[in-house]
Amino acid sequence: MSKGKGKSDAPRIANRRALHEYHIEAKLECGIALLGSEVKSLRDGKLSLDEAYGRVKGSDVWLVGADIAEYPQATLWNHVPKRPRKLLLRSEEREKFANKAHEKGLTLVPLRIYFNARGLAKVQLGLCRGKKLHDKRESLKKADSKREIDRAMRRK
């Protein structure tokens, strides 16, 4: 009997570095065009979003720099790990995000990749502005103080 594809067993790959290096101004969920071996690798959790970003080319939005590892059982018909992948958006969303992405200092960054309830791969894109060094330090201080408070609350 085959195992059902529930929410619990589907991997969620998050770009934790993006939360540290960027202020997220807006979020958008979009689909991604993948090959079969890429989907299998994603289900195994073999993905790196460290160097990934979104790029607007003409009327399309592309995910560039995402590294989906080759699927070992796909031998001859395997995919190229770092190829650009087309993101699937509605035309209104695409135009709105493309116009905002062309503003100075804004970048499209993939925040996470996951499978929805229907088993389709989705990308959560963020419209982000880079943090300055003092902003990063402030974020680290807040996280440290929150951790200390949580630790103290657990002791009581």
Language model regions located:
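Basic Arg/Gly/Lys-rich low-complexity intrinsically disordered segments
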Residues: 1-16, 135, 142
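Ribosome large-subunit tunnel/peptidyl-transferase-proximal elements
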Residues: 10-106
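Switch/connector loops and helix/strand junctions flanking conserved nucleotide-binding motifs
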Residues: 71-73, 122, 133-135
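C-terminal low-complexity, charged extensions that often adopt amphipathic alpha-helices
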Residues: 107-112, 150-152, 156
